[in-house]
UniProtKB/Swiss-Prot annotation:
GO terms for molecular function: identical protein binding; structural molecule activity. Its main location: other. Residues 24-81, 133-160 are extracellular. This is Claudin-23. The chain crosses the membrane at residues 3-23, 82-102, 112-132, 161-181. Disulfide bonds: none annotated. Residues 1-2, 103-111, 182-296 are cytoplasmic. It is a multi-pass membrane protein. Residues 224-296 are annotated as: Disordered. It comes from the Eukaryota. Plays a major role in tight junction-specific obliteration of the intercellular space, through calcium-independent cell-adhesion activity.
């Protein structure tokens, strides 16, 4: 898997910010002082947090100059020393966390750890930005930052500029790495939705059961409402009340007897002889093979 862009950007900006802050802390170049009355015109003093250097065009730079104005005892210098060292230590901790979070030897990055390193870098940038801004605010104030009287000129030197750049790089790199919290939070929310509830879910609305008194009914209404006026079902009704299971089968059509012989054959002869009397009707044999009416 490719490293996300926010992690790559953060891992590029934060080491650069650490390097610039380190140079700004150690180099004697926070303030430039020139224009001394009792010194040559080309004499320049570079004041830092730990040392003061003297530079002249005809000579090389000489460091370790004595502090004639109690410059190192001023409050902005003392605070800047402590905060810049704290910023360097915090940045080193952030690099350690970022190395573990931005997987250099794993397939998947640890988004939570990378986001935490971004927060640490952001705090480190604030630790370095506060003393740099405070020092720059009182740069030309002799009551806060000790300096010789006029016509001495006080200017910003290179270490202060490097401190500004290093702080901004740490802030940007920390913010970029802190964006790694977005996929981490999304994954956590997805797991919380899929996880089953730990216990039985309680309803937010409680159900209240109220036993209302039954209304008093007249004897006639109670008699008819209870069904007492209905006679008990008979056996015939019980049989018909049973449910019939299944589906109706088709019934075959009724069968009828068909005679292939003509049943009216011989009826004319029987009609002619019927006048002879009833006795002769019963004694004559029937010429039809079918049963005759006299046989019935």
């Amino acid at each position: 898997m490719r490293t996300p862009v926010v992690m790559t950007l953060g891992m590029v900006l934060t080491p650069c910010g650490l390097l610039l802050n380190l140079v700004s802390t150690l180099a004697p170049g926070w303030r430039l002082v020139k224009g001394f009355l009792d010194q040559p015109v080309d004499v320049v003093l570079y004041q830092g947090l730990w040392d003061i250097c003297r530079e002249q065009s005809s000579r090389e730079r000489e460091c370790g100059q004595p502090d004639e104005w109690n410059y190192f005892q001023t409050q902005p210098v003392q605070v800047a020393r402590g905060l810049m060292i704290t910023s360097l230590a915090t940045t080193a901790l952030g690099l350690l966390l970022a190395s573990l979070g931005v997987r250099c030897w794993q397939d998947e990055p640890h988004y939570g750890l990378a986001g935490l390193s971004g927060v640490v870098f952001f705090v480190a940038g604030l630790f370095s930005l506060i003393p740099v801004s405070w020092y720059n605010h009182f740069l030309s104030d002799p009551d806060v930052l000790a300096a010789p009287s006029s016509p001495v000129t006080v200017q910003v030197s290179y270490s202060l500029v490097l401190g500004y750049l290093g702080s901004c790089l740490l802030l940007l790199g920390g913010f970029s790495l802190a964006l790694s919290f977005a996929p981490w939070c999304e994954e956590r929310c997805r797991r919380c939705r899929k996880a089953p509830p730990a216990g039985p879910r309680r309803s937010s609305i409680s159900t209240v059961y109220v036993d209302w008194p039954e209304p008093a009914l007249t004897p006639a209404i109670k008699y008819y409402s209870d069904g007492q006026h209905r006679p008990p079902p008979t056996a015939e009704h019980r049989d018909t009340s049973k449910l019939k299971v299944g589906f109706p089968m088709p019934r075959p059509p009724p069968k009828s007897y068909t005679n292939p012989m003509d049943v009216l054959e011989g009826e004319e002869k029987k009609t002619a002889t019927s006048q002879g009397g009833s006795s002769s009707r019963s004694t004559r044999p029937c010429q039809n093979s079918l049963p005759c009416d006299s046989d019935l």
